[in-house]
């Protein structure tokens, strides 16, 4: 099983990347670290939820299909103000093309945005996150 790892950056926003596909998370870490972000990666839903509750992240990149609990469950916990009263992070769903329909409705309303992994390059990811305030 993969471990949680952090790619520190000297300054910048803190990102929690909840992604179990190692290749994808490595691409994100390289691109975002070069852009000055401080990136923490977690592959497991429950551990990611604990990290989000105990750390101040600016942005959370949340895959829907992750081990232990789904990204949808993580999102619901994060948006529950009783559980996460201090959470101010923007939550961006990262999904595969096949999962696009899953994020319609309530899920889309709870997230601050979503990205389809196959449709965005690392450079475009950095540009997109640069627009988030």
Language model feature labels by segment:
Residues 1-14, 121-133:
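Non-catalytic signal-transmission and effector/linker regions of two-component phosphorelay proteins
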Residues 36-43, 51:
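Short hydrophobic/Thr-rich beta-strand motif most characteristic of the beta2 strand and flanking loop
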Residues 44, 70-76:
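Acidic catalytic/metal-coordinating carboxylates
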Residues 63:
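Active-site residues of response regulator receiver
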């Amino acid at each position: 099983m993969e471990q949680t790892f952090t790619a520190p950056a000297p300054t910048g926003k803190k990102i929690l990347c909840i992604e179990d596909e190692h290749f994808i998370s490595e691409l994100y870490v390289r691109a975002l670290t070069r852009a000055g972000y401080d990136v923490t990666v977690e592959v497991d839903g429950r551990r990611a939820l604990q990290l989000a509750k105990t750390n101040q992240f600016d942005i959370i990149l949340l895959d829907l299909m992750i081990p232990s609990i789904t990204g949808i469950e993580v999102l619901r916990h994060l948006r529950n103000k009783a559980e996460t009263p201090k959470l101010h992070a923007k939550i961006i769903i990262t999904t595969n093309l096949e999962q696009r329909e899953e994020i319609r409705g309530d899920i889309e309303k709870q997230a601050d945005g979503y990205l389809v992994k196959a449709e965005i390059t690392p450079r475009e990811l950095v540009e997109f996150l640069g627009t988030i305030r």
